[in-house]
Amino acid sequence: MRDFRRPAALLVLAATAGVAVTAALAGDKGGFMTSAPAQLTAVKAGVEITPLLTVGETLPGGYTFESIPDGIAIGKGGRNVEVYVNHETSTVPFPFNPATGVGFNDFTNAMLSKLTLNKRTGAVLTGAYVIPSEANYQRFCSSFLATRKHGFTRDILFMNEEATDIVNRTGTAWPATPANGSNPEQAGVVVAYDVKSGAYKTIYGMGRHNHENSVAIPGYREPVVLSGDDTFSAPSSQLYLYNADSSAQLWADEGRLYAFKSDAPAVNDYGDLSGSQSVAGRFIAVPEAIAKGDQNALESWSNANNVFQFIRVEDIAYDRKHPNIVYFADTGEPRAISDAATTRLRRGPSGTSGPYPNGRIFKIVLDRRDPLRTATLSILIDADTGGYRNVNVIHQPDNVETTKRSLLIQEDPGSHNQGQTTARIWRYDLSDGTLEVVAKVDQSQRPATPLGAWESSGIIDASKRFGKGAFLVDVQASTLIVQSEQRGTLTYEREGGQLLLVRIPEGGHGDDEDEDNDEDEDDD
């Protein structure tokens, strides 16, 4: 999940006026390794952090690592490690003042990087954009690589647009006028990338909303994919399930979308659950026209059908031992308050200090044989009970990843609960429920930036490729501006960021699967 940009006073350019290029081992056959300082620092004893690639750096082959790295996925690889990294970039101004035309935007639309890493060191051997800016997708957030173990006959990587804007899909994306391009449509779709062929396409039937991630759940012999609405208008978020008879049917956009609904009508939103309470529910079918329609239609349908309302669903990860058990983050919202008239939560005015400032990790248990038949929702971690400005609880959980023993949780404090600490990575022990901070973002390159403004985003267990306890993580350094250019009333910016290899003792295990992945995040 990506935050709105900070005031201009905080946006300090890097040392060079153009793109910063830091070279280390650039001419070595072992690959390129950044010499820039790490944007993440260890907290737990024994944690090791190695920065691999920093935004703005150019490889010998000409590839330049673009800004706002987010979702990470790891391919099968061979002698080397194949890594995919989303870029949560957008040429749509964010924020934007229509009255004055003043806004901030990125240099590119969303893109997908394919990197080849040295298995021994993590150094970058090659890089390329396999989904380019010219595809006109916006704000790719988290990602997930679905494989044979998830009921797919072809490896499909899901990218997820966290956006609501109307954009041209050909020509210039924004503004979406005929003079700029064609094929205008609302963003907020899931994009499927065929790893073998390199083809990619939109899967409209997976719903149009602010997608954080689309995660395939193993054990059903056919595609079962969960996704959540990382809405900009929280609290108004839902949990969706997409089912297809085969990966070929999914690729043809012929699957079906479902939404989670509580069996207890009075327990229909985030605020109705607390403590050790749980609620049974099921996934109900979304009409195809609604699923493939615009975001307002899906939101209106969910309200009319009393679909369970979360505040802001972020990333999703399944339990490695029992994959029908699924964990997902909800970032919370201080302005979320009860509305007696609708029996739903609503957003209060700016400055509201409601009861849900920090967020939660939810747990949903699906039926082992038929995920549509029944599901039980409960709270795994409730950070809201810690109250405001409490450094000892999780603040805005965003991206998550599981190993056989633990759940890794990345924070994105954004504009909530800032000033206490930089964004952290927590480890939750699934066997005994203990929580500990293992690493945190290092904002020392911009000391004037409020603590918590940067975030660590994509996280993926990389232990099968880099050894026990290894993870790939990236950082979004939103106020570390590598490049800035004024074009009329718009300011184009290249925000800083970094890809890192992190080793966490007992955090990842050599026998864990690592093709699953990470959100603003962010996101992520």
Protein language model features and the residues they cover:
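Sequence/structural signature of beta-propeller domains
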Residues: 24-516, 522-524
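Bacterial N-terminal signal peptides that target proteins for export
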Residues: 1-10
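Bacterial N-terminal signal peptides
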Residues: 11-20
